[in-house]
Amino acid sequence: MGRMHAYVLAVILLLGIGPQAWAHDAVMLSPFPADEVSIVAPNSSSAEMMSKAGVNSNEVLLAAYASLAAYQSEWSGLPVSTLQKTGWQVTPGDTGHERFIIASQEMEGHPYYIVAISGTERKIDLKANLRNDMVTIPQYPEISVHQGYWEAAQRLSELPQIREAVASTNYGGRVIFTGHSLGGGVATLIGLQEVSEAAGDLAQMRVITFAAPDFVNSFGSRSIGKYSAVNFRMEADLIPRLFRLVNYRYRSNPNSITWSLHTPSQGIQHAMVGFLDEAFYQAAWTFSANLPTSGPVDIYVAAPALTTDMGLSPRLIQAYRNTAIYAAVLPETQRIARDYREMELSDALATARARGAKYLLWLPISIYPERESTNRNYGMALTEQWWDVDKEELLTWESAAFRSGGYTIFAKLADYLVGKEQIPGESDFLLQN
């Protein structure tokens, strides 16, 4: 690859380095023709396409959490916490070239693994991107792939903990390989490596990636299309197409789903946190679509009413708020209806009444920077309000306040919500009046 091409690619990749690359002023539209895939919002159309690719919305959401957690930064704290609170053991790893995590737990008597590879975060990651020559796979000389990604996949595939995860699929275990951007490309090639070696049961393996670049030739693209591998992209994300600027032979995973955003957004739509938001919305939509739309419930849980002075993208805030709420699993013994739409208190009461709910849980949350702090320290104030829906009366409330450096303030919120042992019972409400 020419020096000028390498320089241009390096500059553009730096624009998207790491999960924090989010706030940019201008909307960037791709100059490339669209792939032969539909552009869909995360809803029924997306769910149908995921089903054809052999994955479901819960697997995509787990992969999104793990892919963000693979970044070794302050942004990874809440996704790691969320995975741990839902039963996953999270173990970080580093080959000296690639960072990754392995999340594992036992489900239905069999091991379940999620292997997530970090995207571009360090200078060494940038070097891997710039090793842009195409090399052939020894077992399949007609397949050519990105050299830097293939070398990374080879190193990771040889790790004993990943070999153990793959081997478990022969005895009922399951594995998801995932990653964002560079990590997505490497995860896909690990899957291709396992296909070529037949080391595990392919029916028990999934590859779910986010913003993986074009990194294989047409033969490789067709080979990827033969196993359960799906790549998610954003409609206006330029970065996954960059390699095709310097080598027209590069192609993408044919099982690609291009998401149009369910909420308006500006800037480069490449950050992993944006994919987490869309994956959460997809899972919430799927969950809600399978619920009965009528019938009484005991409790109606409205989406938190969040105000903030953090100076961040509203969608970034929304993603982390949703993550905190996802981690807060309310008791299953109650008949509960949840809502993820933002609304005013009056609308929440009206919706709760329409569902026949007795009580409404309303969570006003305020996040603010600590003005006197020289570091990025934030405070959070939360009021947990329980309302009588019919009377529109506030029955009881409880306030809490937290402070934290950086965005781990959202992990504090999740810790508080998950730490609640029970929902107040009717007798507790009566004692308050």
Where in this protein do the model-derived segments appear?
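Positively charged n-region of N-terminal signal peptides that target proteins for export
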Residues: 1-6
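Bacterial N-terminal signal peptides
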Residues: 7-17
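Sec/Tat signal peptide C-region and signal peptidase I cleavage site
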Residues: 19-23
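Non-catalytic, mobile gating and regulatory segments of ester bond hydrolases
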Residues: 24-178, 182-294
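A structural "domain/chain start" motif
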Residues: 212-214, 286-330, 425-433
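C-terminal/domain-edge helix-coil "capping" segments
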Residues: 291-299, 354, 370, 376, ...
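A short, hydrophobic beta-strand-centered structural micro-motif
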Residues: 299-304, 345-371
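Acidic helix-start/capping segments at beta-turn-to-alpha-helix junctions
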Residues: 332-348
